[in-house]
Amino acid sequence: MKTKLLFLLGLCCLNISAQTINLQSFATGFSSPVEITCAPNDTRLFVVQQSGLIRILNPNGTINTTPFLTLTSSTILSGGERGLLGLAFHPNYATNGYFYVNYTRAGDGATVIARYSVSADPNIADASSGTVLLTVAQPFSNHNGGSIKFGPDGYLYIGMGDGGSGGDPGNRAQNINENLGKMLRIDVNSASPYGIPATNPYVGISGNDEIWAIGLRNPWKFSFNRLNGDLWIADVGQNAIEEINKVSTPATNTGLNFGWRCYEGNVPYDNSGCPSYSATYAPIAVYVHGTTNRCSITGGYFYTGSTYPNFANKYFFADYCTGEIGWVSSDGTITWNYNGPNLITTFGEDTNGELYVAMGGTIYKMIDASLSVNDFGNKGLQLYPNPVQNELVVKNDNNLLLISVTITDLTGKIVLTQGLDALADNRISVASLAKGIYLATVDGPNGRLFQTKLVKE
C-alpha cells in the first residue's frame, strides 16, 4: 500500500516541460564548492570550498588569486559531509565588516558557528579574528546541515541536521532539549556571544532557547525570498521522499514542527508517540525517489531577478544525484526542466537576484534558454540581423529610454559594451567578435530591459 501511495504522490504534482533552463559556464577552477553568496549590495560572489577556503568571484568571471579566508585542518574537519559548509554576511557588513561561517570542528566534528571580520583589504578577511558563537556536538559524521542565513528580521538562522546515521536513531529532531534536527535562530547583535530573540518558541519554558522550529532531517540548503521574506527550506529525505517547506512571516511564525522522524515528507516514517500529521507543518511540495535515480534535494532560491521574466514566481532547486533542476510554483506543483550531467552541490544568488549553480569545479549562471529575438518585440525593441556578421541594429519602436548594450560570451565574460542614443535606433559594430553564440543585453535607466541570444557568423 505504501509503495502504491508513493507512486501516486510522485504523479499528482510533478510536471515535465520543454527545457527553458540552461546553464552558462561563468567561472571554473574551484574545489568542492558548497556555497555561493554575496554581501549586501556587493557585486562580488563569495564561493565556499568544503576544504576551508572562501574565494572571491568577480562580476567579470575572474577569481581572486588570494582566498578571502583560509581555515586550515587545525580548525576544521573536512571530508564526506563535513567541512566548511556555510557563510552569511551581516546585514551591516559594509560598516561593521562581520561575516559568519558554519564548519565542523577539527578533532570531534562538532558544528561551530563563528564570526570573522574583513581586514583593511576588502578582498581579504582577518583570519585571526575568529570568535566562536555556538557549538553543537555531532554524534555521527553526516547530517550536519550547512546553510546559515540572516532573515528579514535581522536574526541569524542556522539549519541543523538530526545528528546523522539513518532514521534519526536518537529521535533528536523531535527532542526540544537538543539543537539537532532544528532550525535555530539567534540574535548576534544584542549580547555576547549571542542573544535569544524574544519570540523564539521555548523562551522561558522547557526547551532550548535557540530553537525556532523542530522536526528537520538535514536542511542542507535554505533561503529567504528577498521580495516578501518567505523562508524556503529543502529538507533531504531518508530513502523515499524529498521535501520543500515554505514559511511565510518567519519572524512571528515560530514553533513549527516539520515532522521528521515521525513523517518523511507527507508519509509516516516512525510515528510512535508522535503528533498527528495535521499537527505538523506540511511541506508545500514533495517528490519521491520511486523508480528514478533521484535521491537528495539541493535547495535553491525563489527567483527575484529581472533578467528572465519566465523565472518569476518560481522557487528553483535540484536533485543532487540526477543533476536535474526543477521549480515549485505557487500552488506547490513541481516542474522538472533541466537534466544536467553533473552533481549540483549548491545554488547561489547575486545582489541582483540572478541565480548560479555549482557543479564540480565550475560555477554556472542559470539562464532562460527560451529567450529569442522575438522577446525583444515585447518591449518594442528589435535586434537584427540575427545571426549577424558585421553590424547589429537595435531598433527602438516605442521610444524607450536606452542606456547601453552589453554582449557577453558563454563563459559570462563581457566582450562588448556600447552606449546607446537614448531614444533612437542604434548601430553596433560586432565585426571583431569571433563566430559563436552570445547574449546581448539592453539596459535602460532602471536596469535591464531585456536579454536575448545572439549568433555571430
Regions flagged by a language model, labelled:
Residues 82-84, 92-94, 162-334, 356, ...:
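Beta-propeller domain segments
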